[in-house]
């Protein structure tokens, strides 16, 4: 939830200004529960339209965030919310209702979630060009801001990492721990 809150605050808007959430939505129990809890807490009963494109594309791992940001931008420019492909019956325990068929309508602001292994989570707010929110502006206007921190995980080489993960083995990085965690310091 912290990534979503930070993205919304950095955009100078409120949760009520979000028209569509591009869910991380992997269809895995733990991920979907975590994302649903965060959305339900942040948005309450005023949840915007939402869907995940992973049912259409699959999980593209490291490329997922970039692909979903592009889908979010296309949603804004085409005023279209993509369907949650492959979802036939949403889990009622999640208390979320994804868009089941493509939905046409005005979409000016999108929150796109990307959650990584080990809690490396990101969220980005994308808005329609030339449509600023008149009552709120970011305190520090920047073309882009990266909020939070992350660390390099795995071996640094996708093939090696995936083989180790498939075997249930630990992944040893190519960088030493001090170098990897340098950006995690509080100061």
Q: What is the predicted function of each stretch?
A:
Residues 1-187:
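Conserved "HGTGT" condensation-loop signature of ketosynthase/thiolase-family condensing enzymes
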């Amino acid at each position: 939830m912290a990534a979503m809150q930070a993205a919304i605050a950095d955009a100078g808007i409120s949760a009520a200004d979000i028209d569509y959430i591009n869910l991380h939505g992997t269809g895995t129990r733990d991920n979907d529960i975590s994302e649903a809890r965060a959305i339900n807490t942040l948005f309450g009963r005023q949840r915007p339209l939402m869907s995940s494109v992973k049912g259409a594309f699959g999980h593209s791992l490291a490329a997922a965030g970039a692909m979903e940001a592009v889908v979010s931008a296309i949603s804004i420019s085409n005023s279209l919310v993509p369907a949650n492909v492959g979802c036939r019956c949403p889990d009622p325990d999640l208390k979320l209702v994804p868009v089941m068929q493509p939905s046409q309508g005005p979409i000016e602001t999108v929150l796109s979630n990307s959650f990584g292994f080990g809690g490396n989570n990101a969220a980005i707010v994308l808005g329609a060009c030339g449509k600023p929110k008149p009552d709120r502006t970011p305190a520090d206007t920047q073309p882009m801001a990266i909020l939070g921190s992350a660390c390099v995980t795995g071996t640094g080489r996708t093939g090696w990492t995936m083989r180790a993960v498939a075997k249930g083995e630990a992944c040893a990085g190519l960088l030493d721990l001090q170098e990897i965690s340098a950006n995690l310091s509080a100061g």
